[in-house]
């Protein structure tokens, strides 16, 4: 199984509007397009995204850049404060998927998949793209192949 995890691009500052409604900035859109270039030619089967506006915009930019035909799948289990265990429950039957989400979930999820605990989250900048590989999406059972920051 291969799994890609993408943090949304740079968004409007906190307080500009309610957190779920914060949009990408022009710089954030550029960051996302640079990260999307690393997914060209990858065997993606699905793109899952948080319902927050900035994650939806990020996922749509990636979809368009790749010419990815299937629709985006919007899920509530990719919001910022979701526990990584809940994400793993949803990935049991998945392969070659992209998750578009937020910190702290992105960093916690990457640490959990590698180490099996939450004590060592990864540091992921906006539009950072992580690639993991393993037999199954289990805590401590996946290897981080790298994190690309735009």
Task: Describe every region a protein language model picked out.
Residues 114-143, 149-150:
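Domain-level recognition of soluble alpha/beta enzyme cores
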Residues 104-112:
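Extended, charge-rich low-complexity interaction segments
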Residues 79-91:
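Short alpha-helix plus adjacent loop in nuclease-associated cores
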Residues 2-82, 106-107, 120-127:
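Active-site-proximal alpha-helix that buttresses catalytic centers in soluble enzyme cores
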Residues 41-43, 91-95:
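Glycine-rich phosphate-binding loop signature in dinucleotide/nucleotide-binding domains
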Residues 3, 94-101:
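Generic beta-sheet signal
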Residues 38, 61-65, 93, 112-116, ...:
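Active-site catalytic microenvironments for nucleophilic, acid-base chemistry
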């Amino acid at each position: 199984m291969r799994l890609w995890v993408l943090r949304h691009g740079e968004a409007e500052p906190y307080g500009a509007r309610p957190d779920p409604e914060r949009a990408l900035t022009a710089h954030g859109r550029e960051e996302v397009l640079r990260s999307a270039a690393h997914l060209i030619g990858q065997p993606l089967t699905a793109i899952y995204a948080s319902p927050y506006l900035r994650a939806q915009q990020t996922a749509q930019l990636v979809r368009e850049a790749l010419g990815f035909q299937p629709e985006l799948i919007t899920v509530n289990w990719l919001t910022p404060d979701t526990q990584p265990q809940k994400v793993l429950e949803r990935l049991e039957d998945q392969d070659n998927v992209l998750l578009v989400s937020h910190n702290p979930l992105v960093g916690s999820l990457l640490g959990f998949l590698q180490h099996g605990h939450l004590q060592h989250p990864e540091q992921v900048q906006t539009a950072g793209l992580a690639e993991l590989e393993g037999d199954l999406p289990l805590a401590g059972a996946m290897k981080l192949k790298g994190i690309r920051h735009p």
